[in-house]
Regions:
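Proline-centered turn/helix-capping motifs that create local helix->coil transitions or kinks
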Residues: 23, 163-171
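Terminal processing/anchoring signals of secreted or surface-associated proteins
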Residues: 1, 21-23, 51, 119, ...
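Membrane-proximal, proline-rich intrinsically disordered regions
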Residues: 21-71, 97-98
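Short, hydrophobic secondary-structure boundary micro-motifs
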Residues: 28, 63-64, 132, 171-175
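Conserved, well-structured interaction surfaces
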Residues: 45, 85-166, 182-183
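Short linear capping/connector segments at secondary-structure termini
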Residues: 30-33, 135-140, 173-181
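Active-site substrate-recognition loop segments, prototypically the cytochrome P450 B′-helix/B-C loop
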Residues: 75-79
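Bacterial Sec-dependent N-terminal signal peptides
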Residues: 1-30
Length: 184
């Protein structure tokens, strides 16, 4: 009987100790920002900065605003040079023999719709905190209207970049339809 009591006490202690560390395991990562972090004026300002950051791209040929690959090379102002095995996707742009899986076109498409996504995301977040943005202390202008106007400009700008390259038959993505039409 004494042995049965000891085994039962050990089993109860083992089961009780297994449930004690759940709070320790559910700690939020320090460097991670969640959606509530953006639902204020400072968060909206961070989203505006992120939207402007979509203008900069480290790649000279693909998603950049210079449109070197699509304007100069395809227009005949620049030649790719070298031989046909050097950057075959670039050669196909120069000779107008490209396919839908051309890496330069794919990256340009994705970078443009990434800019559209940032603008639409900013519009959705700004609408959630409209009352806070409308009356910003120390500012005479309406911060909400200015934010929405900047986001709509960027959305139009990125759509125009897509239309310049792919023609008028490209999907228009507004702030209600954020996640669709990201891939060509």
């Amino acid at each position: 009987m004494k042995r049965l009591f000891i085994y039962a006490a050990i089993a109860a202690a083992a089961i009780g100790s297994m449930t004690s560390c759940s709070d320790f395991l559910e700690v939020e990562p320090v460097g991670k920002m969640s959606e509530p972090d953006f639902l204020n004026q400072e968060g909206v300002s961070r989203l505006i900065t992120g939207m402007y950051a979509t203008l900069h791209n480290d790649s000279y040929f693909e998603g950049t605003l210079t449109n070197y690959a699509y304007g100069d090379v395809m227009g005949g102002s620049a030649n790719k040079g070298s031989n046909f095995t050097d950057q075959p996707d670039f050669t196909s742009l120069e000779t107008y023999t490209f396919a839908a899986d051309n890496s330069y076109l794919s990256v340009k498409w994705k970078s443009c719709y990434n800019g559209v996504f940032f603008a639409n995301n900013l519009i959705n977040v700004a609408k959630q905190v409209e009352t806070e943005l409308t009356a910003v202390p120390g500012q005479s202008k309406d911060y909400f209207t200015e934010t929405i106007a900047q986001a709509r400009f960027f959305r139009a700008f990125w759509h125009f970049e897509v239309v310049k390259l792919f023609g008028a038959a490209v999907p228009y993505v507004n702030d209600e339809d954020v996640a669709a039409n990201v891939n060509p």
